Amino acid sequence: MPEPRPVALALTDTPTIAEERSVRGALREADAAAGFPHDTRPLAVLLHDEAGKVAGGLWGRTGWSWLTIESLAVPPALRRAGLGTRILAMAEEEARARGCIGARLETCSPEARRFCETAGYVVSGTIEDCPPGQTRFTLTKRLGMVPAEPWPEAAGPRATITRSEGEWDPLVGVLEDGLTGFNMPFGGHHGFRAVNFAVRRPGDAKPVGGLSGHVLYRWFFVKLLYLPEDLRRGGLGAALLRRAEVEALAGGCIGIWLDTFSFQARPFYEKQGYRVFGTIDDFPPGHSRHYLMKRLDGARA
């Protein structure tokens, strides 16, 4: 095997779109080479108020036969009228039409957890103290061929629901603002901050790999980590993780967490001291998605 060429690491919280695409593209190429090409499609359910303004809804994506729900928000004035249930049902119905076998989401709200469990979701994993003093739940639901829930009579004409697939949508900002306000009394300000480590070969401006993540509620999430074949098994991946851990500690983080597929890097992460706290089977079908974490504050994981 040829010796890995020297590389450089660069930390930034203001990555360019091109740099983000380079890291994401490299990971997609690796997954495609392993027989798992990305088939991601956005999925959104928009909730409009009487003035036609987007007031909430659901934002997510489908891929590898699963629906991932990133945000779900209904304004307080429209809650308890069955809209949340209807929004979930619409998203699940579309996911089934796309061939999805399951849905997943995350929440640190006990109220949201109860709502999801009422809708048929079960807890697949938890992280304590994320945000501090709270528990972060990963919930999943198997999607059978179940018809969507009927429109709730109590909702009346107060709101309408529409679906969209746009990559960028005003719905996202509405959901983020709504959830941030809802979470504030429980977890305080989220303190979101993007952090990226780009790996470049000497003399090359274009990144060939790296690590992309963010800080949220004093936890560092490793969203993407990829290195080309000739730069693996030389300690660079472990060095990237250590840089992320040092960055997390310097920022006052409690821990670091990530997810990986069974055909990717679970043994590597476990060797670095991470432990599995949750698993979703058949994601993608025939394989598993593992969630791993590592405490950085000295507390037992």
List the predicted regions and their residue ranges:
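Conserved GNAT acetyl-CoA-binding A-motif
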Residues: 95-108, 248-261
